[in-house]
Regions:
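ATP/Mg2+-dependent ligation/transfer catalytic cores
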Residues: 1-155, 176, 319, 353-363
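Core alpha/beta catalytic barrel or barrel-like domain that forms the active/cofactor pocket
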Residues: 94-105, 114-128, 148-168, 198-218, ...
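Accessory "access/gating" subregions that flank catalytic or transport cores
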Residues: 129-134, 138-152, 166-173, 184-200, ...
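Active-site neighborhood of thiol-dependent amide/isopeptide-bond enzymes
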Residues: 170-182, 205-206
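Catalytic-core signal marking the mid-to-C-terminal active-site face
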Residues: 182, 189-190, 196-197, 220-363
Length: 363
């Protein structure tokens, strides 16, 4: 969850130059003790935006400093370090994130229920009625995102009841992570104002598709050329050798990437082998690579990669950093893709999966 302090406008300069002080021991995962120095959240003023659902407020993203230096446990700083590795090569990782979420409420007994009890189809994906009945929340969230320069281009009902996805254009990895953090804040607050709960829980219903957050990936040059694209690719996937090596790095580190992309116990209910009531989980259970194959961990929309492992409960900074580290390892070692899987992995038995040399993700 995002941590914050409210600062009057007169204190903004101090936050940018010195930082707002936190007791680091009170923030989980910072590796600090109660007798240690303060954790100083130093604001990056380039990220300053209004908070559309709270008139008169603004938001600025910070990086933690301890003793005047960036704190190595700060996840945004972790990503900045990996981004620098790319910049040293003249590259930028572009990521397009696809957050999925459920709209719920509590009944009189305190039990979680769908906001829309009529959203009960076995195959609700792209359902018009379900989308229309939730339009007030979706419109308010979209307007809030657009007010801070998100280019929202489509909204749809997903494959679980009460599940939706909002798509917005890609950006560099650091900006994308900042934006998704803002997205979760906006969705939660706007839902609360409407008496709803917006849940990014990876698998709220064991019988339904879970909430993923697929990462679309490409590397661009200093001239903004997509270095993952090669029209001469004989496979027809439009990928360069660089892209294949990067993808092979993701596959090689698939189990380890779960620690970042699937960070909770509930995450592994989403990655389970098997199907949902609709016939597909839309989540990968196998370490596989395929052309437009949504049952694989790495899918190839023409000329780029889609990493389907992450769920919507992840830390986007850590996932992005891990993606860069794994991909660069694949590039540095010139790893190759052993097998292109163009089959529906949901329909194969575990024996058939093993025969193809495909490994299973941690379960």
């Amino acid at each position: 969850a995002a941590k914050t302090k409210s600062v009057p406008i007169c204190g903004l300069k101090t936050v940018a130059e010195e930082g707002a002080g936190f007791a680091g021991f009170a923030i989980s995962g910072m590796g600090m003790e109660p007798h240690g120095p303060d954790f100083m959240a130093r604001g990056d003023l380039s990220t300053l935006t209004p908070v559309p659902w709270q008139p008169g407020y603004g938001r600025v993203v910070c990086v933690g400093h301890v003793d005047g230096k960036p704190h190595p446990f700060d996840s945004r700083y972790v990503l900045q370090q990996q981004v620098q590795r790319l910049q040293d090569k003249g590259w930028t990782l572009n990521t397009g994130l696809e957050p999925e979420f459920n709209l719920m409420r509590r009944d009189e007994q305190g039990k979680l229920q769908l906001v829309d009890p009529s959203d009960n189809l076995d195959k609700p994906c792209y359902d018009y009625k379900g989308l229309s009945r939730s339009r007030v929340f979706l419109e308010r969230l979209t307007e809030a995102l657009q007010a801070v320069d998100f280019e929202v281009y489509q909204i749809d009902h997903e494959d679980a009841n009460g599940q939706f996805e909002i798509n917005y254009t890609y950006s560099d990895a650091l900006t994308s992570a900042d934006r998704f953090t803002f997205f979760r804040m906006a969705a939660g607050e706007i839902a609360n104002d409407l008496g709803m709960i917006c849940s990014f829980m990876p698998k709220p219903d064991p019988k339904r598709a879970g909430n993923g957050m697929h990462f679309h990936l490409s590397i661009s040059s200093a001239e903004n050329k997509n270095l993952f694209h090669d029209a001469s690719d004989p496979s027809g996937m439009g990928l360069s050798k660089l892209a294949y090596h990067f993808a092979a790095g993701l596959l090689a580190h698939g189990p380890a990437l779960c620690a970042f992309a699937a960070p909770t116990v509930n995450s592994y209910k989403r990655l389970v082998v098997g199907n949902s009531l609709s016939g597909a989980t839309w989540a990968p259970a196998f370490i596989a690579f395929g052309a437009n194959n949504r049952s694989a961990m790495v899918r190839v929309p023409y000329g780029r990669l889609e990493f389907r492992l992450p769920d919507a409960g992840c830390n986007p900074y850590l996932v992005s950093a891990a993606i860069i580290a794994a991909g660069l390892d694949g590039i540095d070692r010139e790893l190759e893709i052993d097998h292109v899987c163009n089959e529906n992995l949901y329909s194969l038995s575990l024996e058939q999966i093993a025969e193809r040399g495909i490994k299973t993700l941690p379960q």
